[in-house]
Amino acid sequence: MLPARCARLLTPHLLLVLVQLSPARGHRTTGPRFLISDRDPQCNLHCSRTQPKPICASDGRSYESMCEYQRAKCRDPTLGVVHRGRCKDAGQSKCRLERAQALEQAKKPQEAVFVPECGEDGSFTQVQCHTYTGYCWCVTPDGKPISGSSVQNKTPVCSGSVTDKPLSQGNSGRKDDGSKPTPTMETQPVFDGDEITAPTLWIKHLVIKDSKLNNTNIRNSEKVYSCDQERQSALEEAQQNPREGIVIPECAPGGLYKPVQCHQSTGYCWCVLVDTGRPLPGTSTRYVMPSCESDARAKTTEADDPFKDRELPGCPEGKKMEFITSLLDALTTDMVQAINSAAPTGGGRFSEPDPSHTLEERVVHWYFSQLDSNSSNDINKREMKPFKRYVKKKAKPKKCARRFTDYCDLNKDKVISLPELKGCLGVSKEGRLV
């Protein structure tokens, strides 16, 4: 299982947490493979004559032999070995087992492992966070991330009851075992029937603030507000919603942000661009002040961005940024879920990411590799079909999804290159949504 939401990585070593962001070619996990797994001969191994050598697996069960473990793993590819021998506590919960396994992995040098948080009863807490990436997200009772719930530099609001209205994303509105309700992501405020989910604190704050100023019109969320304005907005929001753990920006003279920002209730701190407040990927720390540049600013490359003023056909005015933000957030959550679903002891490893890449760039590289099934370095017409379905399902407003692939195809050659995908998703070298 795995995470998503709060701040981000610092050193190249810590970047290894995103080793799994971009699956190695030739190691793709597909739905059909799981569907036919029961017909695999390994799934029906006869283990009665094998020598008993107990194995404790990640599902909390003790398997009497490697044969029995392989048979179970055939049916559940995410299954991993915790240790040789029987599980010490046969009644230990899945969360506690995964936590123990992760803590063991974390002892290895250069490993930035996600360690799940468990409740007193051994169940997964509704909110899970990754210390090094700074992402937090909502999970189901069995620890699976809820699509679209990942956020950064803020704790997500996860409801503990099943909503009457089924959610459009995944199965997050369904009971898992008939006894525990599946938590859902509360995305408030909701405007014009569209959920607003954003991967960054500043986008969400701008949308919330604009909605309060004008209930019928959301202003252009690309506008950058001064730190003083953001601070005042956050203070007002915190006063109205004291239990939501709002981040209150710390300001410097002239409307700038202080280079270090912290979230008091979680203990996380991170570096920001002093002119926009944008968190810098890779700088998140907990209970320790990060070392930040005193005058890091956004680079003015917008004039060279061909997508900046490019019209997205059919998308309501002022909604393009909101649409792209929600799409990138969904991709980030799904990437994290892909990392979680990879068996720790499995043979397939994800390729190591470029240390110079921002998190947003890694998300785009990861998704591009998923789509580029023939490794041609572009997304052709056939490969574009799942992309279209994904955009239509995950991103909002829906009207913006209809012509999005045409919008991405900048040179109109009927294929989408990696630079084009980066551009239409608003990901610059600095990792900002441009």
From Swiss-Prot:
UniProt-annotated binding residues for Ca(2+) 2: 409, 411, 413, 420
Per the annotation, which location comes first and is thus the protein's main one? secreted
Renumbered to this chain, the signal peptide range is: 1-26
**Compartments it resides in:** Secreted, Extracellular space, Extracellular matrix, Basement membrane
Q: In which tissues is it expressed?
A: Widely expressed in many tissues with a strongest signal in ovary. No expression in spleen.
- Where composition is biased (Polar residues), the residues are 149-172
Q: Which residue numbers delimit the EF-hand domain? A: 359-394, 396-431
Q: Which GO terms describe its molecular function?
A: calcium ion binding; extracellular matrix binding; heparin binding
Q: Which residues form the Kazal-like domain?
A: 37-89
| Illness | Ophthalmoacromelic syndrome: A rare disorder presenting with ocular anomalies, ranging from mild microphthalmia to true anophthalmia, and limb anomalies. Limb malformations include fused 4th and 5th metacarpals and short 5th finger in hands, and oligodactyly in foot (four toes). Most patients have bilateral anophthalmia/ microphthalmia, but unilateral abnormality is also noted. Other malformations are rare, but venous or vertebral anomaly was recognized each in single cases.
What the entry lists under PANTHER family is as follows: SECRETED MODULAR CALCIUM-BINDING PROTEIN, SPARC-RELATED MODULAR CALCIUM-BINDING PROTEIN 1
Name the record gives this protein: SPARC-related modular calcium-binding protein 1
UniProt organism field: Homo sapiens
Q: Which gene encodes it?
A: SMOC1
